[in-house]
Amino acid sequence: MFCIQCEQTIRTPAGNGCSYSQGMCGKLAATSDLQDLLIYMLQGVSVYAVKARELGIIDAEIDSFVPKAFFATLTNVNFDDERIMAYTQQAAHYRAQLKASYEAACEQAGIAVEQVPQVAQLVLGTSKIEMLAQAPIALLNKDKHDVHEDIMGLRLLCLYGLKGAAAYMEHARVLGQTDADVAGRFHEIMSFLGEPSVDGDKLFTTAMDIGQLNYRIMAMLDAGETQAFGHPEPTVVNTKPFKGKAILVSGHDMKDLELILEQTVGKGINVFTHGEMLPALAYPAFKKYPHLVGNYGSAWQNQQQEFANFPGAVVMTSNCIIDPNVGSYSDRIFTRSIVGWPGVVHIEGDDFSAVIDKALALEGFIYDEIPHTITIGFAHNALMAAAPAVVENVKSGAIKHFFLVGGCDGDKADRSYFTELAKSTPKDSIILTLGCGKYKFNKLEFGDINGIPRLLDVGQCNDAYSAIQLAIALAEVFECDINELPLSLVLSWFEQKAIVVLLTLLSLGVKNIRTGPTPPAFLTANLAKILEEKFGLRNTTTVEADLKTMLNVA
């Protein structure tokens, strides 16, 4: 086992990364090894997808499968060995299918079949024991003694960034958004990473390419969400329980939320969002469901307590899931899509009757709690509508600075930095937030500036796209570069979606970003220095020192 993809990975003087019997996330060594083998097989599929494309062969089913299965290897997504093995076997099937199509096309065209790299040649074992025996060939640091640590760090930066992009591709696909060109570029990068490179410049360029690719993917996802559900609008949301039977929907998948709402109409069940599903409450399409009553709980890391206290059924539509046995609710949590946990019921297809039956059998909330409301829904359409007023207040001096504070949340004590930063921002500044990092301060009162709320909740982590659109619009109005705006970005990171959002921002030329609470363990000190020199990327220090620098720089 070797896994170093998330913020909570083991860090020791002897080396970084989880490499024992179990990762810090709870992932067993066998599961980690099977996930590495899955990635290896997916890279082999991409090798043939690239070659097949050169001869005009495009398989949309395979284009959709590869990022979806890759998504299963993200932090806190799928811990079920049987499901991981099934994805791996399917990858082997698709690779063979593409290989046959490619070779047939070569024969028809009268050209030679090209030699493929080792990553596309593995004959997959048929049992778990055989697959685990093959796993060392797929170990991410298998050649660590032969390559410079900076090269290893760049490889991992690319791999983990591409994982994040794969997740957003799958979210977009669920909403009907696919793009053959995007899929083709995705395969090219997967294929490239399947042949471990020692070219630092090429790896760095690839990392920026992944960022650019993800910008296109975020635009696809934004189009999918707004076409399906309308543009988010400023919305007041209750965060306290309502009396009655209940279902809690967590993750990111709004299509699943829609299906659950449709299937619970008239059944006397209240539906609550959780975590990154909170932004759904701002979409017009969901406001026609009166039994979508509000948001319950906070960010993913608190779920073992929050789900244990929730007296209804819980649905995990995507990341992040952690051990449901700790809170003794494994019999009433359900997984969807790429999510998996051993022994937890997985919902295939679009029938949520098992979830509904479980909710009806449980007690539900026995009384209403005193409401506490927050305001959400400031995605790019709402931000653009407010832009003239924002510009006027900037010109008058009423608004002097913008802060984007958000990203992933986590359970480390030093993440209190983000709470203190938000509370310490000047009264003449605006705070934009997104992702589950918002839960560090989104229930606090920040007031307004001439009717413009000081705290603007932009949405999910992928809604960094909305924040980018606002920054571009403001830069155009003020006829300046984005980096010349009175704008400071402070991103909390935990997993691979945050990595690819960072790569996206860097690829767009956004500079002077701060990340925290700790730097990725796979980034060497030298790589961190290069990123600081090239982009001004730096780690958070103290609220007082960082605020002083940010406000002075602006």
UniProtKB/Swiss-Prot annotation:
Its cofactor is [2Fe-2S] cluster; hybrid [4Fe-2O-2S] cluster. It is found in: Cytoplasm. It catalyses: A + NH4(+) + H2O = hydroxylamine + AH2 + H(+). InterPro entries: HCP/CODH, Hydroxylam_reduct, Prismane-like_a/b-sand, Prismane-like_sf, Prismane_a-bundle. GO terms for cellular component: cytoplasm. Its EC number is 1.7.99.1. It is an enzyme of class 1 (oxidoreductase). Catalyzes the reduction of hydroxylamine to form NH(3) and H(2)O. Keywords: 2Fe-2S, Cytoplasm, Iron, Iron-sulfur, Metal-binding, Oxidoreductase. HAMAP family: Hydroxylam_reduct. Hybrid [4Fe-2O-2S] cluster binds at H252, E276, C320, C408, C436, C461, E495, K497. One of its GO terms (biological process) is response to hydrogen peroxide. Its main location: cytoplasm. Belongs to the HCP family. One of its GO terms (molecular function) is hydroxylamine reductase activity. It holds the Pfam family Prismane. The modification Cysteine persulfide is found at C408. Binds 1 [2Fe-2S] cluster. The keyword Oxidoreductase applies. This is Hydroxylamine reductase.
